[in-house]
Regions:
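Flavin-dependent oxidoreductase catalytic cores
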Residues: 1-318
C-alpha cells in the first residue's frame, strides 16, 4: 500500500432517495454496487492496505431534479441551503429522520459484511449531517434544533444506530468541520467548551475517531493555543483524531477543483505535532493523488523527492 495506513473512499451515497445528485458518484447500497465495493476492499487488502467507505448524504446542497432519483425532494433540517435566508427545500419530518438514520446504519452493516475495515460518517462541509450541526441551516424548534447539544442529536442518533448495527470492534470515524463549502468562515464552535458540547455526545454514541477537517491544518483553532482542530478534538474527547487540510501543499484544495496546481509546503511542523501526539493520523488528498509514493517517501525521510500538485492528477481520475 506504499506506506498508506488507511484509505478513506470518496463520499458514497447511502440508500436514501434524496441522498445525492450526481450519477457519477458511487452509491453504497444495492446488490450490484456492493458487489463492486467488495472487490475494491479485497483488492486493497491484497495490496496490504486497509479501507473504509465514507458514507454520505448531501441534504440541501442537492440540485432539484438531479441524481439517481430525480423526483425525490431536496431535504434538510429546515429546508435551507447553506448560506441561504429563505427555505427552498423540505423540512425533514421524524419519519424522514428515521429513514436517513436507517440508511446510514444499513450502509455500515453492508460495509462490515463485504469486508471493509470500518466506516466514516460524513458530517462535514455543509452536507446533511453538518446542516443539523450548524445554526445557519438548522432553525428547528423541536428536539433536533436549538442549542449545540440539541443540534447534535441527529448526528448522535446516526452514530448510535450504526454502532448498534455493526460489531463492537468495527471502527466508526466521524468527519466534521467548522467551514462549509458555501461559507468558509462558518463555525460550529467559538470556544473549546462549545466544541466539547458538540463532540461529547458523538463520542458517547460510539465514535472511535474524529476526522477534523480544516482547509489548512497548520492554523490554530482557538485563541491562546497552537492546537489545530484535530488537536483540540483529541484533547477534549480522548478519542483518536485525524488531521487534514492542504498537507504538503501551499494552495487551497478548492482551487484544485478549479484547475489550479499548488506548490509544495514543508511538513516539518506536521511531523512535529504528530510526534507530540497532538493527533494520531494524517489525511492526505491532493499530494497523494499527485504522487502515490508520498507516504512511503515521508516515512523514509525522502521529503526532497515530494512533488508539487498538478491539477492533471485530479483530471486523471475522471
Amino acid at each position: 500500500a506504499a506506506g498508506v495506513g488507511l484509505i478513506v473512499t470518496e463520499g458514497t451515497y447511502v440508500g436514501h432517495d434524496s441522498a445525492g445528485e450526481s450519477n457519477r458518484v458511487p452509491r453504497f447500497h444495492g446488490e450490484e454496487q456492493l458487489a463492486g465495493w467488495a472487490k475494491v476492499a479485497a483488492d486493497v487488502h491484497a495490496a496490504g492496505g486497509t479501507i473504509v467507505p465514507q458514507l454520505w448524504h448531501i441534504g440541501m446542497t442537492r440540485t432539484p431534479g438531479k441524481g439517481p432519483v430525480p423526483d425525490a425532494p431536496v431535504v434538510g433540517p429546515s429546508g435551507l441551503r447553506p448560506g441561504a435566508d429563505e427555505p427552498t427545500g423540505v423540512t425533514m419530518t421524524q419519519r424522514d429522520l428515521d429513514d436517513v438514520i436507517g440508511a446510514f446504519a444499513e450502509a455500515a452493516a453492508a460495509a462490515e459484511r463485504i469486508g471493509f475495515d470500518g466506516v466514516e460518517i460524513h458530517g462535514a462541509h455543509g452536507y446533511l449531517v453538518d446542516q443539523f450541526l450548524w445554526s445557519g441551516t438548522n432553525r428547528r424548534s423541536d428536539a433536533y434544533g436549538g442549542d449545540l447539544v440539541a443540534r447534535t442529536k441527529f448526528a448522535a442518533e446516526i452514530v448510535a444506530a450504526v454502532r448498534e448495527t455493526i460489531s463492537p470492534e468495527f471502527p466508526i470515524i466521524f468527519r466534521y468541520s467548522q467551514w462549509k463549502q458555501e461559507a468558509y468562515d462558518a463555525r460550529l464552535a467559538e470556544t473549546p467548551e462549545e466544541l466539547e458540547a458538540i463532540l461529547s455526545p458523538l463520542a458517547a454514541a460510539g465514535v472511535d475517531a474524529f476526522h477534523a477537517s480544516t482547509r489548512r491544518y497548520w492554523l490554530p483553532e482557538f485563541e491562546d493555543s497552537d492546537l489545530n482542530l484535530a488537536g483540540w478534538t483529541k484533547k477534549l474527547t480522548g478519542k483518536q483524531a485525524i488531521t487534514v487540510g492542504s498537507v504538503g501543499l501551499d494552495g487551497d484544495f478548492i482551487k484544485g477543483f478549479m484547475g489550479e496546481g499548488s506548490p509544495l509546503r514543508g511538513i516539518d511542523d506536521l511531523l512535529d505535532r504528530l510526534e507530540r501526539e497532538e493527533y494520531d493520523l494524517v489525511a492526505v488528498g491532493r499530494a497523494l493523488l499527485q504522487d502515490p509514493e508520498w507516504a512511503a517517501k515521508v516515512l523514509a525521510g525522502r521529503t526532497d523527492e515530494l512533488k508539487a500538485y498538478d491539477a492533471e492528477a485530479l483530471r486523471s481520475l475522471s
